[in-house]
């Protein structure tokens, strides 16, 4: 059951939950650029304490396409947070005005705290370094829309796998499907041990690789996240590693013809812009699908199936 449910961690959702969400999201695609009065009179409160473009805008557009309204803020500037108001008090006030709340925060556990305080359902729009459940839902939905299925696919995840919360949530979502995951990164940027322990306990098939070119011919999906420059003490070491994980036309010469490339965005330089014009590039479509996916999520939580 989705109605009235909080969305805090990817671990909370089953394959059945995801398949129900995907079915409704596919129906919502017809309304993604129009307006349907399914949630007329409902109010979404957004509390984005961290910068966001795609996540915040897609949630706001999704609510408005459903006929609802949006209040809230992006960044603490100009709010009582600047005066020292606690997160708990901010959530209490937003809860008083809203039927559903979306929060993004730099601290892990912020969304869980909000859910404990608020009477309205709370959706985690990204908190800390490890949780971004709706992005993972979108990622897997995009794969499902492109192939028509998820089971049996080989999925490569490339880049900084330790510090990207999208990677953590994606892995925790993919455990619900029969996939093989190729984790492609420097050894010191592999996912944290807690994540590996979890996917192993769920029986996921996975393997570690130092380079993309050695496995590109096996992959159906390449999911790219940026190498985070700020994690490197030696700039030369960063430049060396960055180049070896960049997606270029040359890297793709041995790829399957039906390979798709995904990226949670924003992109820096980890995908060559020449790749944008190829059939492999699905990251902008992926971003666009964020609206119907989040329309479905909001609708199921507020109205039920």
From Swiss-Prot:
Protein's name in the database: Aspartate carbamoyltransferase catalytic subunit
Residues at which carbamoyl phosphate binds: 54-55, 104, 132, 135, 265-266
SUPFAM superfamilies linked: Aspartate/ornithine carbamoyltransferase
Transferase keyword on record: yes
MF terms (GO), sorted A to Z: amino acid binding; aspartate carbamoyltransferase activity
Keywords: Pyrimidine biosynthesis, Transferase
Record's subunit section: Heterooligomer of catalytic and regulatory chains.
PANTHER family in UniProt: ASPARTATE CARBAMOYLTRANSFERASE (PTHR45753:SF6), ORNITHINE CARBAMOYLTRANSFERASE, MITOCHONDRIAL (PTHR45753)
Gene: pyrB
Pathway(s) per entry: Pyrimidine metabolism; UMP biosynthesis via de novo pathway; (S)-dihydroorotate from bicarbonate: step 2/3
Domain of life: Archaea
UniProt: L-aspartate binding residues: 83, 165, 226
EC annotation from Swiss-Prot or TrEMBL: 2.1.3.2
Pfam families tied to this protein: OTCace, OTCace_N
GO BP term, example: glutamine metabolic process
GO cellular component annotations of the record: cytoplasm
